[in-house]
Amino acid sequence: MEKVLTISVAAYHVEQYLEETLESFLIPEVRGQLEILIINDGSGEGINEIAEKYVDRYPHVFRLINKENGGHGSTVNRGIEEASGKYFKTVDGDDRVEAEGFADLLAYLERAEEDLIVTDYYRFDDGTGEWIDTMRHRFEGKEYGRSYRFEDICDQVYINMHATTYRTELLKKMKRRLDEHCFYVDAEYILYPIPYVETVVFLQRPVYGYRLGLAEQSVNIKSMQKNCLHHETVLEHLLDFYGEACHTLSEAKKRYVERGVARILVSQFKIYLSFEPAGQWKAKIKEQDARVKKDFPGVYQAVENSAVKLLRRSGYLLYPLASKACRRAYHCDQEGR
């Protein structure tokens, strides 16, 4: 019997959280529909000991895959390769799913035909486990459970990685793989499938629970400064993807990809601005922006961030003030040069 959903669990130094993550999938009425790939990304025997308990108890649900360390992108790539379920979702080994929303998702997937299923997600506190807030995908006239042509609604919404469940066949068609040995590949996972996405549906209950408050998270500004080159790599590959795909995409999909890449461009500028002001960071912003304006004008024009727009209008003369404001917002100290 074909599994309805493959879940790829990225497991790297998450021994403290992995059991909670795996337990969250074990809803009796739906677990038989699941293929759960626990992908140990070179993290050692601690992960294996936990995973093997679940493989032994539920051999038709869980599968342990050991691989050399390659980063989050490599676990997603491997998960897509190994997946046999009708649909595919990726879950970090320190996050979880919400029971009622997850059961609703599985019930829908049994009969689903859409390329992309979107569910809202929530954030919870690492210390207390309490639900903090729900991240919703809103647009005018949105109807839950209605199948939309992606092109008809994509100007009104931008879909986060944690909200996505893709048709597996679609992901296997992708010409590009996610970057390996690299942080910040979420945007690649969001955008690389877009040429193949024709239909989308939104479901009402939140499914994915994102753990908030881990000091080592890659979105922490200190981590972003440390891994600035990773972010630059992802931006470059997204620009390459856009350059290749823009000639074949519909206008609506093209605008969607432009907005997505523009978000990463803005994030790159924020990283540069978060360092202590110096000529090298100002030069990087100016050079990057000039190149994008020349080679990828659609992405350049898709930038919506008011601070970046103001910086451009000033001819980058406001760089010192912009850097000061950014550093204040992120509570940066004098380190990280």
Positions of PLM-derived features:
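Short, well-formed alpha-helical segments that are part of the catalytic scaffolds
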Residues: 14-27
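Acidic helix N-cap motif at the loop->helix transition within catalytic regions
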Residues: 19, 45-54, 100
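Short beta-strand/loop segment that forms part of the nucleotide-sugar
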Residues: 33-42, 63-68
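A conserved acidic beta->alpha catalytic loop
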Residues: 40-49, 71
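Glycine-rich, basic loop-to-helix element that forms the pyrophosphate-binding segment
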Residues: 67-83
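Donor-binding/catalytic cores of nucleotide-activated saccharide
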Residues: 72, 76, 93-201, 208-225
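Membrane-interface aromatic/basic loop that binds lipid-linked glycans or pyrophosphate carriers
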Residues: 114, 273-337
